[in-house]
Amino acid sequence: MKPAARRRARECAVQALYSWQISKNDIADVEYQFLAEQDVKDVDITYFRELVGGVATNSAYLDGLMKPYLSRQLEELGQVEKAILRISLFELSKRSDVPYKVAINEGIELAKVFGAEDSHKFVNGVLDKAAPQIRPNRK
């Protein structure tokens, strides 16, 4: 699958996970509704499903990975930033096929698109500290 389709999968995953985090609805329902209502013709649907399902299933684990590197309490973290960090940390910890730098750079780019004004700097700072602990070989 083309990198652009994966990027779109990540963008859609941020939106779906944001909705899930806010609504507390079943993740399968959120995923189904998102795919039914959004234009996803240029999206790697398989990867979107892997991200959404993987992040939802592993959210407590992923939150534990980010907690030591947050400058504030997890509960104070914005929902967009939380979704983005969860996706990037999922890719770093559970998707060895995603290169180290790609997982970090994609997280930063997602924060530029969806986050508040300086959230990309915050996401970069957290990932910059967490990533070497998750993948010491930086591959």
Curated annotation (Swiss-Prot):
HAMAP family: NusB. Disulfide bonds: none annotated. Transmembrane segments: none annotated. It holds the Pfam family NusB. Keywords: RNA-binding, Transcription, Transcription antitermination, Transcription regulation. This is Transcription antitermination protein NusB. GO terms for biological process: DNA-templated transcription termination; transcription antitermination. InterPro entries: NusB-like_sf, NusB_fam, NusB_RsmB_TIM44. The lineage of its organism: Bacteria, Pseudomonadati, Pseudomonadota, Gammaproteobacteria, Enterobacterales. Involved in transcription antitermination. Required for transcription of ribosomal RNA (rRNA) genes. Binds specifically to the boxA antiterminator sequence of the ribosomal RNA (rrn) operons. Belongs to the NusB family. CDD domains: Terminator_NusB. Gene3D superfamilies: NusB-like. One of its GO terms (molecular function) is RNA binding. The keyword Transmembrane does not apply. It comes from Erwinia tasmaniensis (strain DSM 17950 / CFBP 7177 / CIP 109463 / NCPPB 4357 / Et1/99). One of its GO terms (cellular component) is cytosol.
